[in-house]
UniProtKB/Swiss-Prot annotation:
Gene symbol of the encoding locus: mutS
Region (Disordered): 799-824
Binding site for ATP: 618-625
InterPro entries: DNA_mismatch_repair_MutS, DNA_mismatch_repair_MutS-lik_N, DNA_mismatch_repair_MutS/MSH, DNA_mismatch_repair_MutS_C, DNA_mismatch_repair_MutS_clamp, DNA_mismatch_repair_MutS_core, DNA_mismatch_repair_MutS_N, DNA_mismatch_repair_MutS_sf
GO cellular component: cytosol
Organism taxonomic ancestry: Bacteria, Pseudomonadati, Pseudomonadota, Gammaproteobacteria, Alteromonadales
A Pfam family assignment: MutS_III
Protein name per its UniProtKB record: DNA mismatch repair protein MutS
BP terms from Gene Ontology: mismatch repair
Keywords for the protein's UniProt record, in alphabetical order: ATP-binding, DNA damage, DNA repair, DNA-binding, Nucleotide-binding
UniProt keyword DNA damage, yes or no: yes
Compositional bias per record (Low complexity), positions renumbered to this chain: 806-824
Stated family: Belongs to the DNA mismatch repair MutS family.
Annotated S-S bridges: none
Coiled-coil residue spans: none
C-alpha cells in the first residue's frame, strides 16, 4: 500500500480522505467508488476513464483548495464499461457501500469487494467465449527464463522452462496472455512492451522459497515431486508470483486450481513466433480470425471445444500413438455416421468448463446452476450414443464424461425452471425444496387472500360499504374508509393517515399480521440465501469429476468437429510413419480453397532422405507461397489428429516447422526488413535438424543482387548438405536452379504460366524442373502499373538481356530466365566511355586511331 501523509489527508473532506486511503491501496488500478446509484472516479483516474470510455470529465467541488476532476458512470451499466476496460488491458478495483447510511456517522463505510483484471476474469459477460483468458508471469534467470500461465476461468495451470529469448517469444505468441506479470529486474522489455496488460511486480513475489510454499499450500501437498516440476526453478518462481497475484485479487479460496503441468517442448512440434504468424493458425496478419486455419476448422459445438481446438493448433503433437488414437476416433465417427448426432447433443452442454470455475470461486449465478442442470440432464442420451463407439479414445472419453444423477436431481429439486440473474432478490429456490422456506413464503404470498377475507369480515361487522383494505410501501397495511362514513368506525381503529375524502386506519389484528408478513419476507430471503450457499457445498465435492467431464466433452467436441470437416470438405486420413519424409498426393491449401472463387489446383509434394530440398521457381502470383504453406499446414493438421486436404498423405516425424516468408520492419526494435529476414534465417540455420520442415521464401531480396544471391546460395547449400532438413526454397534467383546438379538431395520444381500477347494466365500446377521465366512485367501490369512505365521497362529489359547474352555465352545451354540475371546492368556506352578516358590521342598512329574507332563503336552498341 502506498503511504499517505496524514497532514495531507487532513486538508481533504472526510469522504475524500476515505477515497484517497482506498486509492492508495490500489495505486495501479482504476478505483470505482460507489456513490448512491453511480460509481465515481477522481483525479487521474477520472481523466483516464474519460479518455478510455468516452465519458464526461467534470469536477466535484474542491478538496484541499483545488477542484477535483471527476467522472461517473451508472452502477447498472458497470459491466459494459468493465468489458471495455479489460479488453484494453486496464484493471479496476470496485469499492461498494457496505455500511447503512441511516446509522453512519460521517462517510458511509465502504470496502473494495471486487478486483477485475484482464487475466483474472471469470464473469461470463467479460470473457471472450472462444479464447483462453490467460494470466502469465515471466521470470528471467542468469540463463534462460521461467514462464507460467494460469487460466483462472478453467483452472489450467502450466509452466515452462525456456532456454532462449526466441523460445520465450514463441511461447508468448502461442499463449497470447491477456495480462503479463514481470519482475522489476526483467531486462528484455522490448519483448513485452507491445503487449496489453503488462504489470511490473516486486522482486519478492518471485522468491523461490515463497513461491514453493504458496504452491504447496494451494495444492495441499508436502512436495512438488508428484507434478514432476521440482527442478523447474525459474518457472516455479513465475508460478509463485501468479498464485500471489490471484490470491490478492480474488479474495477467496481457489479449489479448482489443484494441479500444475509442465509444458515439455519435446512432446510437440516446435513452432517459433514467425512460423505461428506466417501460417496464420488462429490469427491472421491483420490480427483478426477470418481466413485462418482455425476459421476453416472450427465447427465445434461448444465454446470449450473451440478453445481446445485452438490450443491443439498451437501445439501439434509428436507422439504417433496419441495422433493415431485421434485419427481412428475421427474415422469411426465418420464410418458410423455419429458425428452429427453427437454434435447436436454437445451443443446443449454450454460452457461447463467456465461454469465449474465460477462454482469453485463461489461466484456462480443462478443461471449457471440452471445450465449445469441442463447439461447433466443430457448425459444419459450422450452416453447412449457413445455406447455405439469402440475406439479406445472414444471409450475413454465416455468414461470421463460419466453421469451425475444425484447432482442433477439436487439441482432439479432446488432451482426454479427459469431463475433470475441474481440471488439478491430471491425467487431462485424451488417451492417444495425446503419446508421452512415454503412456510415463510406462504405467509408472504398468502397476504392477498387474507386481506380479501379481512375486508369482507370488517364490512359486515361495521356496516361500512366503502371500507377497503390496502397496502403501500410507505405506510404498510391499512383500512380505508370514506370521510362520509368515518363516524361509523369502531374505537379499536387507530387513524394512520388522512387523505382528501378518505381516512386510513390500522387495527391491532392488522398490525400483528403486517409485522408477521414483513418479517416472513425478510426471513424467506435470508433462508433462501443460506440454502443457496449450501448448494455450493453440496456440489463442490464433485468438482474434480465435473471438471473431467467438461474436459472430456471438449475433446469429444473437437473430434466430432474433425469428423464433420473431413466429411464436408473432403479431407482424407493421413498415414503417420516413423520414416522421415512427406509424401502428399493432390494436396490443397485448406484456407485458400475455401475462399477462392475458382477451383483450387491440387499439387503433390515428395520429400524424403534422397529428395529433401525443393528449389521452387515460377512467376510472381504463380502460387509458390501458397504451395509451400499448404505443405506446412497439411503436416500440422495431421499432427493434431485432423484429416487433411489431400487425396493421400504419408507424414513422417517432424520436430520443428520453420517459415521464412515475407518480412516487414521491426521499428520497435530498430530492425530493418533485411535484418528481420536475416535474424529469422539465422534462427533456422542454428536450430533446424534433418526432421525439420523448412519453408524459405525469397531469401536475400532485401539487399544488393550479389549479396542476396550469395546469401541465398549459401543458406540453401547449408540446409541441403549439412542439415539435410526437409526444405522448400522459393526463389527468383535463377542461378539457384543449378544446385540440384551440384548437391545430392536437391531438386527443382516450378509453377508455370501461359503468356498470350500482353496477358498472362497462371497455371498454379507444380511441375518438375526449373521455371523458364518470371513474368515480372506482366504481373506489374496486372497490378496496375501505368502502361508507359511497362513499355519503358520492356525496352530496358531487352537492352539488359542483349548485354547478358553477349557477356555470358557459356551459360547458353542452361534454361534462360534473363530477368533473374545477377549482373548489374551498366549504363548504355559506359564501357566505351571508360575506354576513351584511358586514351592519349597524341600517342596514336593513324592506323591505331582507325582501329580504336571501330572498337569504340562496337562497345557503344553493346
Amino acid at each position: 500500500m502506498t503511504s499517505i501523509d496524514s497532514s495531507e489527508l487532513e486538508k481533504h473532506t472526510p469522504m475524500m480522505r476515505q477515497y484517497l486511503t482506498m486509492k492508495a491501496a490500489h495505486p495501479e488500478m482504476l478505483l470505482f467508488y460507489r456513490m448512491g446509484d453511480f460509481y465515481e472516479l477522481f483525479y487521474e483516474d477520472a481523466k483516464l476513464a474519460s479518455e478510455l470510455l468516452g465519458i464526461s470529465l467534470t469536477a466535484r467541488g474542491k478538496s484541499g483548495g483545488d477542484p477535483i476532476p471527476m467522472a461517473g458512470l451508472p452502477y447498472h451499466a458497470v459491466e459494459g464499461y468493465l468489458a471495455k476496460l479489460v479488453q484494453i488491458g486496464q484493471s479496476v478495483a470496485i469499492c461498494e457501500q457496505v455500511g447503512d447510511p441511516a446509522t453512519s456517522k460521517g462517510p458511509v463505510e465502504r470496502k473494495v469487494v471486487r478486483i477485475v483484471t484482464p487475466g483474472t476474469l471469470t464473469d461470463e459477460a467479460l470473457l471472450q467465449e472462444h479464447q483462453d483468458n490467460l494470466l502469465a508471469a515471466i521470470y528471467q534467470g542468469k540463463v534462460g527464463f521461467g514462464y507460467a500461465t494460469l487460466d483462472i476461468s478453467s483452472g489450467r495451470f502450466v509452466i515452462a522452462e525456456l532456454d532462449t529469448q526466441e523460445a520465450l517469444e514463441a511461447e508468448l505468441q502461442r499463449t497470447r496472455p491477456v495480462e503479463l506479470l514481470y519482475s522489476e529486474d526483467f531486462s528484455n522489455l522490448s519483448l513485452i512492451n507491445h503487449l496489453k496488460g503488462i504489470r511490473r511486480r516486486p522482486e519478492w513475489e518471485f522468491d523461490f522459497d515463497t513461491s514453493v510454499n504458496l504452491l504447496l499450500q494451494q495444492f495441499g501437498t508436502k512436495d512438488l515431486h508428484g507434478f514432476g516440476i521440482s527442478d523447474a526453478r525459474l518457472s516455479l518462481q513465475a508460478a509463485g508470483c501468479l498464485m500471489q497475484y490471484v490470491k490478492d485479487t480474488q479474495k477467496t479460496a481457489l479449489p479448482h486450481i489443484n494441479a500444475i503441468v509442465r509444458f515439455n517442448q519435446a512432446d510437440s512440434i516446435i513452432l517459433d513466433a514467425a512460423t505461428r504468424r506466417n501460417l496464420e493458425l488462429t490469427q491472421n496478419l491483420s490480427g483478426g480470425r477470418e481466413h485462418t486455419l482455425a476459421w476453416v476448422l472450427d465447427n465445434t459445438a461448444t465454446p470449450m471445444g473451440s478453445r481446445m481446438l485452438q490450443r491443439w493448433l498451437h501445439q501439434p503433437l509428436r507422439d504417433n500413438n496419441i495422433i493415431a488414437s485421434r485419427h481412428n476416433a475421427v474415422a469411426e465417427l465418420i464410418e458410423a455416421n455419429l458425428f452429427d448426432e453427437l454434435h447436436q447433443q454437445l451443443k446443449s452442454l454450454g460452457d461447463i468448463e467456465r461454469i465449474m470455475a465460477r462454482l469453485a470461486l463461489r461466484s456462480a449465478r443462478p443461471r449457471d446452476f440452471a445450465r449445469l442442470r441442463q447439461a447433466l440432464s443430457l448425459l444419459p442420451e450422450l452416453q447412449h450414443t457413445l455406447g455405439q463407439c469402440k475406439t479406445p479414445l472414444l471409450t475413454k472419453l465416455a468414461q470421463l464424461i460419466g453421469e451425475f444423477p444425484a447432482e442433477h436431481e439436487l439441482l432439479e429439486n432446488a432451482i426454479v425452471d427459469s431463475p433470475p440473474m441474481l440471488i439478491r432478490d430471491g425467487g431462485v429456490i424451488r417451492s417444495g425444496y425446503h419446508s421452512e422456506l415454503d412456510e415463510w413464503r406462504a405467509l408472504s404470498e398468502g397476504a392477498s387472500d387474507y386481506l380479501t377475507e379481512l375486508e369482507a369480515r370488517e364490512k359486515q361487522a361495521t356496516g361500512i360499504s366503502t371500507l377497503k383494505v390496502g397496502y403501500n410501501r410507505v405506510h404498510g397495511y391499512y383500512i380505508e374508509v370514506s370521510r362520509l362514513q368515518a363516524d361509523k368506525v369502531p374505537l379499536s381503529y387507530q387513524r394512520r393517515q388522512t387523505l382528501k375524502g378518505t381516512e386510513r386506519y390500522i387495527t391491532p389484528e392488522l398490525k400483528v399480521y403486517e409485522e408477521k408478513v414483513l418479517s416472513s419476507q425478510g426471513k424467506a430471503l435470508a433462508l433462501e440465501k443460506q440454502l443457496w450457499d449450501q448448494l455450493f457445498d453440496l456440489i463442490l465435492p464433485k468438482l474434480n469429476e465435473l471438471r473431467d467431464f467438461a474436459n472430456a466433452a471438449a475433446e469429444l467436441d473437437v473430434i466430432c468437429c474433425f469428423a464433420e470437416r473431413a466429411e464436408s470438405l473432403h479431407y482424407t486420413q493421413p498415414q503417420m510413419v516413423s520414416k522421415t519424409g512427406i509424401q502428399i498426393n493432390a494436396g490443397r491449401h485448406p484456407v485458400v480453397e475455401r475462399v477462392s472463387s475458382t477451383a483450387f489446383i491440387a499439387n503433390p509434394v515428395n520429400l524424403d532422405a534422397k529428395r529433401h530440398m525443393l528449389i521452387v521457381t515460377g512467376p510472381n502470383m504463380g502460387g509458390k507461397s501458397t504451395y509451400m504453406r499448404q505443405v506446412a499446414l497439411i503436416s500440422l493438421m495431421a499432427h493434431i489428429g485432423c484429416f487433411v486436404p489431400a487425396d493421400s498423405a504419408v507424414i513422417g516425424p517432424i520436430d520443428r516447422i520453420f517459415t521464412r516468408i515475407g518480412a516487414s520492419d521491426d521499428l520497435a526494435s530498430g530492425r530493418s526488413t533485411f535484418m528481420v529476414e536475416m535474424t529469422e534465417t539465422a534462427n533456422i540455420l542454428h536450430n533446424a535438424t534433418s526432421q525439420s520442415l523448412v519453408l524459405m521464401d525469397e531469401i536475400g531480396r532485401g539487399t544488393s543482387t550479389y549479396d542476396g544471391l550469395s546469401l541465398a546460395w549459401s543458406a540453401a547449400e547449408y540446409l541441403a548438405l549439412q542439415i539435410k532438413a526437409m526444405t522448400l526454397f522459393a526463389t527468383h534467383y535463377f542461378e539457384l536452379t543449378q544446385l540440384p546438379d551440384l548437391i545430392p538431395g536437391a531438386n527443382n520444381v516450378h509453377l508455370d504460366a501461359i503468356e498470350h500477347d500482353d496477358t498472362i494466365a497462371f497455371m498454379h500446377a507444380v511441375q518438375e524442373g526449373a521455371a523458364s521465366k518470371s513474368y515480372g512485367l506482366q504481373v506489374a501490369a496486372l497490378a496496375g502499373v501505368p502502361s508507359h512505365v511497362i513499355q519503358a521497362a520492356k525496352h530496358k529489359l531487352h537492352q539488359l538481356e542483349s548485354r547478358d547474352n553477349q557477356a555470358s555465352p557459356a551459360v547458353a545451354s542452361a534454361p534462360q530466365q534473363q530477368s533473374l540475371s545477377l549482373s548489374p546492368a551498366p549504363m548504355m556506352g559506359e564501357k566505351a566511355l571508360n575506354k576513351l578516358t584511358t586514351i592519349n590521342p597524341d600517342e596514336l598512329s593513324p592506323k591505331q586511331a582507325l582501329d580504336l574507332l571501330y572498337e569504340l563503336k562496337k562497345l557503344a552498341k553493346s
